[in-house]
């Protein structure tokens, strides 16, 4: 009986002595999963004429024109400059959160053959892509455009 007790005691002491698992690691940097391209969605005014372009879609509306583009992410200054023709430092760019994205918005004026134009830009940045919305219309219709653009710009998102 004494032998059985000692054997039982030794077995119970040794049962937790299993070999530790060996983990293997692979060399190289750990890369984050790539962010997939999303679709840009916007509420388009009724009666707008759509024109497909190389880098997005352009709509001619009754009082203004608007365009949606998806550009490579990265330098916001380059994107703002490409959309507005102005240096980002010469504009007041408002920043806010839009879900998991960052929302950048600004306005500017420009001269054209038709006269002074009011312009508005918006960029949604997901870290990999810039989802861009721009609108342009006659500056003398500023109040009317602002009302219409508020609805359109608030509807803009990427899914």
Predicted regions and their residues:
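Signature of long, low-cysteine stretches enriched in small and polar/charged residues
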Residues: 84-128, 136
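Short, isolated positions in well-ordered beta-strands
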Residues: 42, 66-68, 101-103, 117, ...
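Short, solvent-exposed secondary-structure boundary motifs
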Residues: 38-52, 81-86, 109-115
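Short, well-ordered strand-loop elements centered on a beta-strand within folded domains, enriched
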Residues: 77-78, 129-133
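Short beta-strand-to-loop capping motifs
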Residues: 72-73, 135-137
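A short acidic-to-branched-hydrophobic micro-motif
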Residues: 59-82
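A short, sequence-level motif marking secondary-structure junctions
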Residues: 47-50, 71-77, 123-126
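N-terminal targeting sequences that direct proteins away from the cytosol to non-cytosolic compartments
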Residues: 2-64, 127-129, 136-159
């Amino acid at each position: 009986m004494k032998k059985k007790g000692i054997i039982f005691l030794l077995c119970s002491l040794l049962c937790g002595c299993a070999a530790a698992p060996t983990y293997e690691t692979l060399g190289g940097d750990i890369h984050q999963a790539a962010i997939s391209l999303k679709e840009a969605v916007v509420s388009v005014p009724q009666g707008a004429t759509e024109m497909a372009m190389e880098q997005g879609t352009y709509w001619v509306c009754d009082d203004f024109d608007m365009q949606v583009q998806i550009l490579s992410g990265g330098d916001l200054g380059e994107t703002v400059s490409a959309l507005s023709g102005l240096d980002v430092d010469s504009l007041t760019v408002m920043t806010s959160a839009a879900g998991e994205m960052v929302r950048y918005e600004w306005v500017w004026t420009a001269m054209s053959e038709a006269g002074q134009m009011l312009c508005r830009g918006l960029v949604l940045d997901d870290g990999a892509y810039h989802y861009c919305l721009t609108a342009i219309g006659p500056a003398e219709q500023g109040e009317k455009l602002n009302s219409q653009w508020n609805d359109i710009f608030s509807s803009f998102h990427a899914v």
